[in-house]
Structures are given as C-alpha cells and as structure tokens.
From Swiss-Prot:
InterPro entries, alphabetized: Ac_CoA_lig, ACAS_N, AMP-bd_C, AMP-bd_C_sf, AMP-binding_CS, AMP-dep_synth/lig_dom, ANL_N_sf
Stated role: Catalyzes the conversion of acetate into acetyl-CoA (AcCoA), an essential intermediate at the junction of anabolic and catabolic pathways. AcsA undergoes a two-step reaction. In the first half reaction, AcsA combines acetate with ATP to form acetyl-adenylate (AcAMP) intermediate. In the second half reaction, it can then transfer the acetyl group from AcAMP to the sulfhydryl group of CoA, forming the product AcCoA.
The record's account of how the chain is modified after translation: Acetylated. Deacetylation by the SIR2-homolog deacetylase activates the enzyme.
Transmembrane segments: none
Ligand binding (Mg(2+)): V547, H549, V552
Protein name (record): Acetyl-coenzyme A synthetase
Keyword check for Repeat: no
Keyword Acetylation: yes
SUPFAM superfamilies documented for this protein: Acetyl-CoA synthetase-like (SSF56801)
One cellular-component annotation, GO: cytosol
Species assigned in the record: Synechocystis sp. (strain ATCC 27184 / PCC 6803 / Kazusa)
HAMAP family: Ac_CoA_synth
Amino acid sequence: MSDTIESILQEERLFDPPTEFSERAYVRSGREYEQLYSRAASNPEKFWGELAEQELHWFKKWDQVLDWQPPFAKWFVGGQLNISHNCLDRHLTTWRRNKAAIIWEGEPGDSRIITYAQLHREVCQFANALKSLGVQKGDRVAIYLPMIPEAAITMLACSRIGAPHSVVFGGFSAEALRDRLVDAEAKLVITADGGFRKDKAIALKQEVDKALEHGAPSVENVIVVQRTKADVTMTAGRDHWWHELQPQQSAHCPAEPIDSEDMLFILYTSGSTGKPKGVVHTTGGYNLYTHMTTKWIFDLKDTDVYWCTADVGWITGHSYIVYGPLSNGATTVMYEGVPRPSNPGCFWDVIERYGVNIFYTAPTAIRAFIRMGEAVPNARDLSSLRLLGTVGEPINPEAWMWYHRVIGGGKCPIVDTWWQTETGGIMLTPLPGAIPTKPGSCTKPFPGIVAEIVDLDGNPVESDQGGFLVIKQPWPSMIRDVYGDTDRFRHTYWEHIQPKEGQYLYFAGDGARRDKDGYFWVMGRVDDVINVSGHRLGTMEIESALVSHPLVAEAAVVGRPDELTGEAIFAFVSLEGNAEPSEELKKDLVKHVTEEIGAIARPAEIRFTDVLPKTRSGKIMRRLLRSLASGQEISGDTSTLEDRTVLDKLREG
C-alpha cells in the first residue's frame, strides 16, 4: 500500500464547484453538506424516515425505521411498497406520462425512445407473461440479456410481481451462468438469440442451452428475445419467443404490495474463495437509497438526459441505469455497444445526438478515450454536458484531469464515486454543487454513511496513513445476506475486524487513507480479487478454470497494473509431468479460460513455472507473485516461504 499512498500524496489540486452549478444544485455549499451530514449522523432513523415519506410511495407505512441486530439490518419494518410502482405508476398521473423514460440505441445504429406510459404498458404485459408461465412471488428469475430495453422491462416486471431477479452479465460463459442458475434455484431464464458487441453478433441462447444441458434442474421455462435474428434451437414446451408471448398479454397488472424487507434481487459478485457470492438486496431500503443518491449526487433535474454507460449485468446498471433514475422520473440512456476501432467516437455521438447532460462511466473507458486522442471527442458537440462521473475503480489524477478538460470542457464537476455490489448504492462521493474536488479522491461520505479508516484491530489510523476502509453504521441499501450462505456473509463482511463492545464494522476489502481535509482516497483491493476494467473477478474462479485444463497441474492468478484496464490478469501455471511449455499452449489456455468463464477473465499473460511460492502450510504466497508480475522488488516478510530458491526461478521466467 505504501507506493500507492506515496504517489497520491503529491496530489494537491483542488477544484471548486462552478458558481452557476452550485446556485441551482440541491445541495449548494459545503456548509449545507455539513448540516445535512450532521443531521443524518445524529439521528439516522429520523433522517431516513423523513426522506422515505417524502420521496417514495408506500402502500403501507412502516412500524419501525430500523431494526439493527448486528450484522443483520431490517429497514422500514412492516412497510409495504413496490419499486416498479415507484419507477412507473406514480409518474403516469403527472406530465411525465409522455416523457421519455428510456432512450435506447443499439450498436448497429437502431434506436427506440420509450415513454413512461409505454414502458408501464410493456412491463405490465411482461409481468403477466411471467405469471402465465407459473412465476409467483418469491420465485427467482434469471436474466441473461444484452443491453436492450427488454433488460430493464424484465427487471421491472419481476419486481412488480415480487419475483426476485438475478441478472447475469452477457459476457459470462455457459459454465458461469449454470453456477448462478443452480445457486439461485432460478425457475425461469430470459435471454436473447444474441447481442451486438464490437461489431460482432455474440451468441446468448446457445450459452443458455449449454448451461441447461449441464444441469440446472430448477429452470422450467426460457423466454427468448429476437435481437440478432440468428438461428437458434427452440426446445418445445420449454422455450418461448418474447415477441409471441408478450404482446398477447393484458396491459393491466397492478403492482403487488411488497414487504420492505422482501428480496428484490440476487446479484453475483466474485469472491476469493472460488464460488461467486449471491449478494441479496431487499426492496424498501434499496429503493430509497438509490433514489436519493441518484437525485443528490447527479443533481438530477426533470429536464436532464442522463447516461450511465454500465451494463445492467453489474450493480451500477441496476442502481444507476434502471432503479435510481426511473424512481426519480428521469430520462435514462441505454447503449448496447462500446467504443471500438470501427467507431471510436460512438459515445460522443450518443451525447451529441440526444443532448446528454450527465455522463457516468468507468476509468477504464476514460483511459481508452485518452489513447484514441482528443481529436475524436473534439469533433463532436459535447456542450450539453453539465456533470461527469466515474465508477468501478479509483481514477488516477491525470485521467481525471483529461476527463475534466477534454470531455467536460473545464466546466463540468466530476463525481468520483466509491461503492460496491454489496453497498447497493454510492457511499463516498462529492455532492457536485457543495464539495470541492481533488483529482483521484472520492472526497467524502454521502449523508448517512459513517466511514472510517482503521487498522486490523479496528482502531482509527492517523490522517494520511493507509488502512482498511470500513462502514460503522447500517445504511438502507446494505447487503442483507449471501444467498444460501449466512456464514459466508458474516465471515466476509463482519468478522475480518472483530466486533468490540457490540460495534460491528462492515469490512469493504479496500485499502484507503483520509487526508488532512477529511477527503478519502481509495487505494484498491486488499483481498485476492482482481479489478479488470472496473469488474471484480475472483482469482479462484480463474485458477479453477486453468486447472480444469488437462495439462495444468496448478495455477495462481494475480493482478498487475495495466494502463488501459486498471489491472490485467497474470497467471503463473505449473504443467503436468510430461507437458511441454509452448506459445501454442498459452493460446490454448487463454481460449480455455474464455470458454469456462468468459472473455472478461482472459489472462493477459501466462508464465509457466515448475513450482509456486508457498508457505510451509501449503498456501500460495500471492503477494510475492503480485510483486513479480508487476516487476517490483520483493519486500515484506518472507519468513514463512517454504523454498527460497523458488523466487529466483520465477524471476528467470
């Protein structure tokens, strides 16, 4: 951690919110932020209770704002609401009825603009389609779709009838999909024939077929959206075309009153122990927290066109493409494609075409834009932009400066946000009209979030000292459980730092520091999770995929710094006795991992080795491998290393 602290400590630049922006913002000054933060900290139940009453529609008011039995939280106990109703129905009685809810553009250039009234109709029809196939409240529904409107429609239809959804990123392989279907015990899968990415049609239905062939006995039906028009196999009695099933349904489907603590969705995130974690989020607290963070952090106004470039397969897409913006009655942009050699300026074209005002993307995308050069964005009119955001990983100060100068024209505040799948919503962030920003810092906690930097004993560290980022008090959108594995929930998030006197600390797994001005600087993961392009991938999943190859005896995977993706995957591989290392075998292993997990987990480099550095108890010392992969000197304690000659062999490659 010391290197990271050293380099970031040199950052002294400070950018005040533009006066014109502050004058119109929800929170207009540092003083207002401090008052808001103080009010939330002194009486969180009153703070969140008042906001829940003002901002959301409830079928039945709660009896208790918070029931906190550490580490288990229940918010708005006894209250009933429906997030689909809050995202749709309540807007239909206002002028927003005919406002654009979703502006969608496909990679080939096709597009749709869907109003709130139209979206409500399609969601109701699809909710009835789900019911016609026997989906009931509490049944899990898996969604494996490209970035098309049907992804949002499906999520809202599931939440309308109380069926928790589990969205699986379309880049995951059949094997990874099957693991998630089995763990969630999904009753139904919604997929497409395929999607478009980087000028190629990507097959999805055939991956679902493979996953089901390998065994996911809970799945009874599959609904298929026709996107690429590819030929796909349809299994009679199990598979149904969306375009045949949905339009024949009634557009009348009242939103079910849902208990505040009923499960809204399961979203799988990588862990260091191999099996992906099914993060459970519930309804009321998540609805409120994503609503408020969207409103205040993006300073969202009714006239704004808002675009978050994430995929709905990740938490950012759940919270800040679908639920947060639509609950606020916003116009949210969905784009199927990504910048690619044939169209490096596609993002800037979307901004120019639709007059996007708020743009939220990942540092890895910004690094790619920098490589493409300034001429590409400079050829477009980006003057509609008034706020920029970053998400997924810490952004380095120079990328921040480029983003501010080239994309924001030097006038747009940047909200550099830190949060996780488990937190449900943004935790550390500037409020753009109130908090001066420092390039590379996610600045301060959102009102109601009590964050601290501590050592492993839970003691706060001094200013500018690196430590572990923890959250000290419950918040409405916090993870409720790991699906089917409460022991893992306790161990992963609440027992890294032992509770003292009943004080439980949520362990984020990130290293961080706080400077003399109280600004937080997140320094990256402290566990064995690799952050590639803002996506957290478990080392154990990748290692398991490598070892499943018949010629591989053992594998260890680490991250090494990468200018474009933040971290790249570096694999150390030991082969079976008579297997010979070769460039051909490296290519075969890369292909194998891609098939097992997906292209996102493809190793950037593979190094063959006879042995791996291990402790005397047989644990691989990944810390040493990280140093080797990054070309750094080995430092720190190596006393537990079983065979010291291993390091020399690895250095020689």
